[in-house]
Each structure stands twice: as structure tokens, then as C-alpha cells.
């Protein structure tokens, strides 16, 4: 009996395994019995960060999130006993992390180098920085559970971090810190449950692969305004929605996702650069601090509401996979405070390629185009973490996470496995067109193939705030579709042989394409287009279409019939005004003046047609 192994002897068991084989970012280790799936390990003498992705006997397969050159067989592998997690707390906004939440700015200061050294071990959030903590109405003796708010930290002038009790914690409050300055290691809350005392700091740690719990998911009902006319009017997304932007190289995916992060009506932006060019991330870092948005009459830098997860194409492949999960976990943390968060993933194709590379190293059975068979499932687990929710705990609050994923299919081919898997999951599809981009028509959204499944959900919002908008949108889509059908005839027989009403349709479609759907992201007047301006422009163009068509149809049988040429000659001024509606600057001119100008143009337009018909 005496030589039987007892449980207490297990503690003597070594926490070290040994490296058995190395293949690129995939390391196999032996003597790893007792370790768990997705456990975080430190590989080799440099202590490289890795994660267990397969267990077989006492062998573990580890994907390493750093460069593995120099790791040899027999090197130690240290088990940490916890999953890959991110730190959540004050200090996230305005910072830039890599795929596994290492703070790039701090590492740069610490090492004085432009490269990240191997096995660097820094905390994601600064432990020494002091934050001003203000307790909410939580007193000693009150009962709290996971998700309850117990304090507020003003992280900066744009974002107030509401301190949340960790989702699994509960108990009676024994101590709550008075208002004052604390760092992330100071205890601000103590709870007791079943005689067990738990101490809480302002810092929470959460595993990235696990969604944060919520009370219930709610249907989305408020639009995510992007400031891009073509998207807001024809293919709207909702707060808490999922969107894909597939497009070939040079079509302007990054410009659209940057415009979204600059001008959308979200409270917090998480921008994940996943395997894209390094200079795109540096462009974001250069532009965002200079960009401002106005909140309650005060101009603030946009960087204050943004966190960047940068994982450029020359960083280790495995970390690309983690970067998407890091980004979505940060987003869920702010959602739980009751904010509307927008997460940009640029681009999910690179993430899928990282999956493909790791899967190839593991010798798994490849499916379509060499991607692993679980590609669709992985994409779904990521996109399904979006949504509008009722948050855990008290007071009652609602938050949302909207995901906008850019997809770059090779050669702009939308039948690529990543694109087709993504389109099966997301609700909004903004398809970018190479031909439009070559014609310098930006944003190069192809209005014939794009779609949004949120139209029905948003009808109530539009009816309440912009009652004339829905019929206008339907009419625009009809005109653009009609123009597509007519263009084939025009190529065969020329414009002159068309019916007069068709000529009107063609000209109005041209007006729509050149002066409504096109938008210059680099001009002060047009880089963002508020929704009232979009609706005003639509109303006037459609009024012109209806009246012109009516004038042509009603006089077709009479002697002095009005043709399109007559209209064009007598309406030069009106048509010029219609095409220059976009030059009204929402910042300089203001909402009142723009609306008044558009109403005046509407009156002039009706009057001009009355004069013409008389």
C-alpha cells in the first residue's frame, strides 16, 4: 500500500515539460501530462508565449506566438495553469497592443528598439499609473453579484470606465474604497460569501476564447451611422450588427473601415489590424490623434475612444489568430459597461490564412483551397459575439458590439472559401468593385451586389425620425437597377433611340452615381455626411426625377411636348445646384442652414417645372 501514489504527491510533479520537436511556430512538447487544452505555456529559455492546441498522451502540441528560432529539443516548457487571457481595466483607451496584448509603446520605451525582443514579459496595463476612482451607491453590507457597477474611473474626457464586478463574483460588501487616486494593484472592493473573502482591484483578467456572459440578447433597432452616404442610405448596418467588406486590393477597404472608426456613432472603437501592412497601422496612429470629434460642444481627439490591436504581416503568424480574439474581448468589456462598441477587423482573410498555416503544420485534413474544415465554425464563433445585449447586473443597461470585417479574397474573387463562409454568417454585405475603383469612383461599393438584411429592423426608426426616407430609398434602388438594364441597350443602339422617360432615368442615375454615391474621404465637406444631409440630397434628386418624368409623360401626346433636351436646356441652373448639394459643409454651415438651403432648392425646382409646363 505504501508505494501507491497519493494525491498530495502530485504537487511534487514537475511543472516543466520538454521540447520534443519544433516546426515553425508549432512546437511539440513531452512530459506534459496534466496540462489542459488552450493552456498558456512558456517555451524554452527565452520563455516564449505559447498555447496548447492539441493533447495526445503526455505529448502537447503548442502554437507559439513568437519567433521560434533558437529553440532546441530538450528545452524546458513551463506550464502556467491558466488560459490565454487579456487584462481589462483603466488604461486600454488610446493604447496600442500586439496580438497577445503586449503594450507596444511601453515595450518601445523599455527596450529603445524598433523590434520586440523575444520572451518580453510586460504587463498589458501600467501598474504604476494612478486613476481617480469614484464609488457609486454601493455601501458596506450591500449585496452585489457579477456585472454590478460599483464605481467610475474617468479614463479620459471621452470615456468613463464603469467598474464592473467580475462576472463570476458575488457576495456582501465588506469594504469599498473611498473616492481618491488608486493604481491597478490597490484593492478597491472586498466581498464576502460563505465566509470566504475576495479582494477586487480595478483590473480584471478574462480568457479571450470565452465570450463574456450577458443577461439576454436583444434585437437591434438603431442604425450604425457611418458618415458614408451610399452605406447609410442603401445598405444600413445596425448597432450590434455584423458586416463584411470583401474587395480586391486597392478597392478602399481600409479607407472605409478607417472612416467608420473616425466618424461612426459608436462610443468606443477597437481597431484590429490583423496581418495587414505595417504602414496602414502607422497611418492610423498618425491620423487618429489629429482627428477630432465634438462631444457636448468640446472638441476631443478621436484616439481617446480608440484602442488598437496591431498585428502586422511581418509579426508571427500564430498571434494573428489571437489578435481577433483579443480585440473582441476588449470590445465585450466596454459593451458590459453599457457602451456601443464598433470593432474593425482588417482583415479576416489574413486570420484565415494563419489558421490554414497552423492547420497545415498539424497535418490536418485540408478542405476547400487548403483551409481547415473548421474555418466556417471559427468565423461563426467570432462573428456571433457581436450583438445588442442587456448587460449582466445592476443598474440595467444595454450595450452593443458591431463587427465590421474586411475580407481580401485573392484576385477579388467572391467565391473564395473565406468570403463565402463569411457571407453565410454576416447580415450586411458591402461588396467592393475593382472596376469602380479603377474609374476612381469611391467608396467603390457595387450597389447591385451589396445588400443589408437589417432594412426591416430599421423601418421603425426611420418612420419615427425620417418618415419620407424609406420610399425614397426604394425609388433610388429602382432607378439604379433600371439604369443597369438600359446600359446594355445604350451600348448597342446609342442614347438617341431611347424613349424620353428612359433618358430621364439615365440622367438621374448619372446624377445619383456621380454626386450622391460618390464621396471624397479626403475633403473637409464630404469626408463625413450626416444623415439629415443624405436624406435632404435624396429628396431633391428624387423630386427632380418625379417632376421631370411627369412633365415628359404628360406632354408626350400634345403639340408642345417637353423632351429631355428641353429640360436640360432650361434647367441648367437647377441641375448644377443638384450636383453641388454635396459641397455644403456640415461643420461650417451647420444643420439649420443646410436644411433651409435644400428646402429652398426643392421650392425652386417645383417652380421651374411649373414655369416650363406653362
Swiss-Prot record:
<feature type="binding site">
    <location>
        <begin position="247"/>
        <end position="254"/>
    </location>
    <ligand>
        <name>ATP</name>
    </ligand>
</feature>
<dbReference type="InterPro" id="IPR024034">
    <property type="entry name" value="ATPase_F1/V1_b/a_C"/>
</dbReference>
<keyword id="KW-1278">Translocase</keyword>
<dbReference type="InterPro" id="IPR022878">
    <property type="entry name" value="V-ATPase_asu"/>
</dbReference>
<dbReference type="InterPro" id="IPR055190">
    <property type="entry name" value="ATP-synt_VA_C"/>
</dbReference>
<dbReference type="GO" id="GO:0071456">
    <property type="term" value="P:cellular response to hypoxia"/>
</dbReference>
<protein>
    <recommendedName>
        <fullName>V-type proton ATPase catalytic subunit A isoform 1</fullName>
        <ecNumber>7.1.2.2</ecNumber>
    </recommendedName>
</protein>
<dbReference type="InterPro" id="IPR027417">
    <property type="entry name" value="P-loop_NTPase"/>
</dbReference>
<dbReference type="InterPro" id="IPR020003">
    <property type="entry name" value="ATPase_a/bsu_AS"/>
</dbReference>
<keyword id="KW-0813">Transport</keyword>
<dbReference type="GO" id="GO:0000221">
    <property type="term" value="C:vacuolar proton-transporting V-type ATPase, V1 domain"/>
</dbReference>
<dbReference type="InterPro" id="IPR023366">
    <property type="entry name" value="ATP_synth_asu-like_sf"/>
</dbReference>
<dbReference type="Pfam" id="PF02874">
    <property type="entry name" value="ATP-synt_ab_N"/>
</dbReference>
<comment type="similarity">
    <text>Belongs to the ATPase alpha/beta chains family.</text>
</comment>
<dbReference type="GO" id="GO:0046961">
    <property type="term" value="F:proton-transporting ATPase activity, rotational mechanism"/>
</dbReference>
<dbReference type="InterPro" id="IPR005725">
    <property type="entry name" value="ATPase_V1-cplx_asu"/>
</dbReference>
<comment type="function">
    <text>Catalytic subunit of the V1 complex of vacuolar(H+)-ATPase (V-ATPase), a multisubunit enzyme composed of a peripheral complex (V1) that hydrolyzes ATP and a membrane integral complex (V0) that translocates protons. V-ATPase is responsible for acidifying and maintaining the pH of intracellular compartments and in some cell types, is targeted to the plasma membrane, where it is responsible for acidifying the extracellular environment.</text>
</comment>
<dbReference type="GO" id="GO:0016887">
    <property type="term" value="F:ATP hydrolysis activity"/>
</dbReference>
<dbReference type="Pfam" id="PF00006">
    <property type="entry name" value="ATP-synt_ab"/>
</dbReference>
<keyword id="KW-0067">ATP-binding</keyword>
<dbReference type="InterPro" id="IPR000194">
    <property type="entry name" value="ATPase_F1/V1/A1_a/bsu_nucl-bd"/>
</dbReference>
<dbReference type="GO" id="GO:0033176">
    <property type="term" value="C:proton-transporting V-type ATPase complex"/>
</dbReference>
<dbReference type="GO" id="GO:0007035">
    <property type="term" value="P:vacuolar acidification"/>
</dbReference>
<dbReference type="InterPro" id="IPR031686">
    <property type="entry name" value="ATP-synth_a_Xtn"/>
</dbReference>
<dbReference type="InterPro" id="IPR036121">
    <property type="entry name" value="ATPase_F1/V1/A1_a/bsu_N_sf"/>
</dbReference>
<dbReference type="Pfam" id="PF16886">
    <property type="entry name" value="ATP-synt_ab_Xtn"/>
</dbReference>
<comment type="subunit">
    <text>V-ATPase is a heteromultimeric enzyme made up of two complexes: the ATP-hydrolytic V1 complex and the proton translocation V0 complex. The V1 complex consists of three catalytic AB heterodimers that form a heterohexamer, three peripheral stalks each consisting of EG heterodimers, one central rotor including subunits D and F, and the regulatory subunits C and H. The proton translocation complex V0 consists of the proton transport subunit a, a ring of proteolipid subunits c9c'', rotary subunit d, subunits e and f, and the accessory subunits VhaAC45 and ATP6AP2.</text>
</comment>
<dbReference type="GO" id="GO:0046034">
    <property type="term" value="P:ATP metabolic process"/>
</dbReference>
<keyword id="KW-0406">Ion transport</keyword>
<dbReference type="InterPro" id="IPR004100">
    <property type="entry name" value="ATPase_F1/V1/A1_a/bsu_N"/>
</dbReference>
<dbReference type="GO" id="GO:0005524">
    <property type="term" value="F:ATP binding"/>
</dbReference>
<keyword id="KW-0547">Nucleotide-binding</keyword>
<dbReference type="Pfam" id="PF22919">
    <property type="entry name" value="ATP-synt_VA_C"/>
</dbReference>
<dbReference type="GO" id="GO:1902600">
    <property type="term" value="P:proton transmembrane transport"/>
</dbReference>
<keyword id="KW-0375">Hydrogen ion transport</keyword>
Amino acid at each position: 500500500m505504501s508505494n501507491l501514489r497519493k494525491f498530495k504527491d502530485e504537487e511534487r510533479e514537475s511543472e516543466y515539460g520538454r521540447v520534443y520537436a519544433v516546426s515553425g511556430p508549432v512546437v511539440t512538447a513531452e512530459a506534459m501530462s496534466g496540462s489542459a487544452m488552450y493552456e498558456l505555456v512558456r517555451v524554452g529559455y527565452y520563455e516564449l508565449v505559447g498555447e496548447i492546441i492539441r493533447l495526445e498522451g503526455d505529448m502537447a502540441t503548442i502554437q507559439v506566438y513568437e519567433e521560434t528560432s533558437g529553440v532546441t529539443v530538450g528545452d524546458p516548457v513551463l506550464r502556467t495553469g491558466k488560459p490565454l487571457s487579456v487584462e481589462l481595466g483603466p488604461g486600454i483607451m488610446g493604447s496600442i497592443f500586439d496580438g497577445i496584448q503586449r503594450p507596444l509603446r511601453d515595450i518601445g520605451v523599455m527596450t529603445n528598439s524598433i523590434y520586440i525582443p523575444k520572451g518580453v514579459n510586460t504587463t498589458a496595463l501600467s501598474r504604476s499609473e494612478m486613476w481617480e476612482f469614484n464609488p457609486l451607491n454601493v455601501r458596506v453590507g450591500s449585496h452585489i453579484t457579477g456585472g454590478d457597477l460599483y464605481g467610475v474611473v474617468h479614463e479620459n474626457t471621452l470615456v468613463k470606465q464603469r467598474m464592473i464586478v467580475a462576472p463570476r463574483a458575488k457576495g456582501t460588501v465588506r469594504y469599498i474604497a473611498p473616492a481618491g487616486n488608486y493604481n491597478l494593484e490597490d484593492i478597491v472592493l472586498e466581498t464576502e460569501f460563505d465566509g470566504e473573502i475576495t479582494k477586487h482591484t480595478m483590473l480584471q483578467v478574462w480568457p479571450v476564447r470565452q465570450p463574456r456572459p450577458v443577461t439576454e440578447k436583444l434585437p437591434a433597432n438603431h442604425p450604425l451611422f457611418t458618415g458614408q452616404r451610399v452605406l447609410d442610405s442603401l445598405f444600413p448596418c445596425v448597432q450590434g450588427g455584423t458586416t463584411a467588406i470583401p474587395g480586391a486590393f486597392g478597392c478602399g477597404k481600409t479607407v472605409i473601415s478607417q472612416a467608420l472608426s473616425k466618424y461612426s456613432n459608436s462610443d468606443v472603437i477597437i481597431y484590429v489590424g490583423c496581418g495587414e501592412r505595417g504602414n496602414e497601422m502607422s497611418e492610423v496612429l498618425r491620423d487618429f490623434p489629429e482627428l477630432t470629434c465634438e462631444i457636448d460642444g468640446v472638441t476631443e481627439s478621436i484616439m481617446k475612444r480608440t484602442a488598437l490591436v496591431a498585428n502586422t504581416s511581418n509579426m508571427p503568424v500564430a498571434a494573428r489568430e489571437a489578435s481577433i480574439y483579443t480585440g473582441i474581448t476588449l470590445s465585450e468589456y466596454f459593451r458590459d459597461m453599457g457602451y456601443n462598441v464598433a470593432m474593425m477587423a482588417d482583415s479576416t482573410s489574413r486570420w484565415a490564412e494563419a489558421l490554414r498555416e497552423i492547420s497545415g503544420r498539424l497535418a490536418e485534413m485540408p478542405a476547400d483551397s487548403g483551409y481547415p474544415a473548421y474555418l466556417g465554425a471559427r468565423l461563426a464563433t467570432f462573428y456571433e459575439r457581436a450583438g445588442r445585449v442587456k448587460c449582466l447586473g445592476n443598474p440595467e443597461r444595454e450595450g452593443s458590439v458591431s463587427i465590421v470585417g474586411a475580407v481580401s479574397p485573392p484576385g477579388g474573387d467572391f467565391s473564395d472559401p473565406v468570403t463565402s463562409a463569411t457571407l453565410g454568417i454576416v447580415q450586411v454585405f458591402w461588396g467592393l468593385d475593382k472596376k469602380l475603383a479603377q474609374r476612381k469612383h469611391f467608396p467603390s461599393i457595387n450597389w447591385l451586389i451589396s445588400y443589408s438584411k437589417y432594412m426591416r429592423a430599421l423601418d421603425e426608426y426611420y418612420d419615427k425620425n425620417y418618415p419620407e426616407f424609406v420610399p425614397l430609398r426604394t425609388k433610388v434602388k429602382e432607378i439604379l437597377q433600371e439604369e443597369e438594364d438600359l446600359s446594355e441597350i445604350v451600348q448597342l443602339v446609342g442614347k438617341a433611340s431611347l424613349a424620353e422617360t428612359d433618358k430621364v432615368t439615365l440622367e438621374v442615375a448619372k446624377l445619383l452615381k456621380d454626386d450622391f454615391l460618390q464621396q471624397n474621404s479626403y475633403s473637409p465637406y464630404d469626408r463625413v455626411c450626416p444623415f439629415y444631409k443624405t436624406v435632404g440630397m435624396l429628396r431633391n434628386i428624387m423630386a427632380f426625377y418625379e417632376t421631370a418624368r411627369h412633365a415628359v409623360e404628360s406632354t408626350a401626346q400634345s403639340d408642345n411636348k417637353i423632351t429631355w433636351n428641353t429640360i436640360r436646356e432650361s434647367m441648367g441652373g437647377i441641375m448644377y445646384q443638384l450636383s453641388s448639394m454635396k459641397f455644403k459643409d456640415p461643420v461650417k454651415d451647420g444643420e439649420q442652414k443646410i436644411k433651409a438651403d435644400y428646402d429652398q432648392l426643392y421650392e425652386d425646382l417645383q417652380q421651374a417645372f411649373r414655369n416650363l409646363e406653362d
